[in-house]
Amino acid sequence: MTEKIAILIDSCSDAPQYLQDKDYVKTVSMQIHWDGKVLRDRVDISPDQFYRKIKHGASIPTTSSPQSGDILEKFQELEKEGYRDVIAICISSGLSTTYNQISLLASQQSNLNIKVIDTKNIGIGSGLFAVYADDLIKKSFPFQKLCN
């Protein structure tokens, strides 16, 4: 029997769109703080909109990790969809608190077996971890082997 494995990524892990569109892949949005507003990356503002604003002289924003409620919501969605095993792929813990935050929240989930990966990368470097995990899932790798 094939295991039902999900992938959770943060929005700074630039995984290809085809991967983000899969039912078993969930994305938690980083927060962008810009001119007094808090925007969810790839929800409230697209990468194209972001770069257009920068090009037209907008102030430089700051970012923060996803809200705990958003992460918990994704965990709940996965559980309701019948997933028990989740591989959470995060950008570098040296650049963001996202890894620590997801690790803490994952440890509180009694109905999900969650392996949190610190890619020690950002952007496409982190996104490639998600591509690789997806490839191993398609090849029916068991969850424990996938996590190693």
Question: Model-found features: residue ranges?
Answer:
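A short acidic-Thr-Gly-centered motif at the start of a beta-strand
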Residues: 1-2
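N-terminal glycine-rich anion-binding loop in soluble enzyme alpha/beta folds
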Residues: 5-65
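Short beta-strand segments
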Residues: 8-9, 88-92, 117-118
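Short glycine/proline-enriched coil/turn segments at helix->beta-strand junctions
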Residues: 23, 83, 110-112
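Surface-exposed, flexible loop/turn segments at secondary-structure boundaries
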Residues: 33-35, 94, 122
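Class I S-adenosyl-L-methionine
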Residues: 38-88, 92-108
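Active-site histidine-anchored catalytic micro-motif
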Residues: 97-148
